[in-house]
């Protein structure tokens, strides 16, 4: 089926979203045009406002509309802990754990094959933040449990070690409520390597 230039442009615009292929983009575009024009207008308005009004926090680099995000402007948070994550969505995930320290958001993970070195993901800015705020006593490396995430955590841990700072890594393993026969071998191996004695 051949689409008009404006419909084709809308379909192509939807395809920039992660996980949205040609068919899904077509369905989205046609749904808005055929059945929900007011929803499409609200989407366009909200998208325009967000693109113009949302930037990065001056300290942690998460997404925010202010100079400082709510976590960085909260004076009650623990200034001795810094949690390093790969992206803004990770901040929201860690917040659900009850963590009350500070954050630093990288722009992804090290991936030399994709041309992403330390500068591209913000490691120099991380080290500058740590140098400027001398209250940090522990840096929690909460990068993803992928090969790239592990490499990123190891690289940062080495830099921190050279500065005499404590680096810790979040534990990986069997999810709460998970069944062992459904867990992949790599995850189970991490669980065994990170086992702890039972406190009685």
UniProtKB/Swiss-Prot annotation:
Q: Which CDD domains match?
A: TOPRIM_recR
Keyword terms: DNA damage, DNA recombination, DNA repair, Metal-binding, Zinc, Zinc-finger
Keyword NADP tagged: no
**Which PROSITE patterns does the record associate with it?**
RECR, TOPRIM
Ranges for domain Toprim come to 80-175
Could you name the domain of life of the organism this protein comes from?
A: Bacteria
**Positions of C4-type zinc fingers:** 57-72
Q: Name one Pfam family in it.
A: Toprim_4
Q: Name one GO molecular function term.
A: zinc ion binding
One of the GO BP terms on file: DNA recombination
Give the family per the record.
Answer: Belongs to the RecR family.
Report the protein's function.
May play a role in DNA repair. It seems to be involved in an RecBC-independent recombinational process of DNA repair. It may act with RecF and RecO.
Name the UniProt record assigns to this protein: Recombination protein RecR
């Amino acid at each position: 089926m051949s689409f008009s230039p404006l419909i084709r442009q809308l379909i192509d615009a939807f395809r920039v979203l992660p996980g949205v292929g040609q068919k899904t983009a077509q369905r989205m575009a046609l749904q808005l045009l055929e059945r929900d024009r007011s929803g499409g207008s609200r989407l366009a308005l909200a998208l325009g406002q967000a693109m113009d009004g949302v930037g990065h926090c001056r300290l942690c680099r998460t997404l925010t509309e202010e100079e400082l995000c709510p976590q960085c402007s909260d004076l009650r948070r623990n200034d001795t802990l810094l949690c390093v994550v790969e992206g803004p969505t990770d901040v929201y995930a860690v917040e659900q754990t009850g963590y009350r320290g500070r954050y630093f958001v990288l722009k992804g993970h090290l991936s030399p094959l994709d041309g992403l070195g330390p500068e591209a993901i913000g490691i120099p800015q991380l080290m500058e933040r740590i140098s400027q705020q001398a209250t940090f006593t522990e840096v929690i490396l909460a990068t993803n449990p992928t090969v790239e995430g592990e490499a990123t955590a190891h690289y940062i841990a080495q830099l921190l070690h050279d500065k005499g700072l404590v680096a810790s890594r979040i534990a990986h393993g069997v999810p709460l409520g998970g069944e062992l026969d459904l867990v992949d071998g790599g995850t189970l191996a991490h669980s065994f390597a990170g086992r702890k004695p039972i406190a009685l």
